[in-house]
Amino acid sequence: MQMEWSDGKKRCCWANPKNERYIRYHDEEWGVPVHDDGKLFEMLVLECFQAGLSWECVLNKREAFRAAFDGFDLEAVCAYGEDKLEALVRDPGIIRNRLKIQAAVTNARAFREIQGEYGSFAGYLWHWTEGKVVYESGLTHSELSDRISKDLKKRGMKFVGTTVIYAYLQAVGVIYSHDGGCFLEHKTVV
């Protein structure tokens, strides 16, 4: 259920009207198709850290994650060794879950392998829908997220269950899911 916000717009029920960062994310980022591998990698790292937590918690720490993970530079993250992992575990600005931190490095390496195979991670991701945006709402997983999750796990990625991947696909605009009544519900994206 949407409520009227102070700016007169209705938004998805999950958007927190008291968090400006969250409002900007909802209005300007969530559901916008992404074809840039740097942005796709950043969102994959953040979505994996979200597993079991609220997205708002991760979003509030986004800048700290960006600093801690070298601007989400793929090659830098791929090169992380034990010293860097230990430093990340001690970083109070991020979620200090050792398994998720290790997964970020493992996933970076798998991401790079996928780039080599498909020319880009975007090429890999968008091939699942033949480059088209999927319009659906009210779900936490789908047959599409099931297939992509299974494939990413087969490639060695961690924290990429179907619910995480569904949220990722929504975040990067492969799946467009603004709630009924949201001012962005009927926006056509390309």
Describe each model-derived feature in a short phrase.
Residues 1-190:
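HhH-family (HhH-GPD) DNA N-glycosylase catalytic core used in base-excision repair
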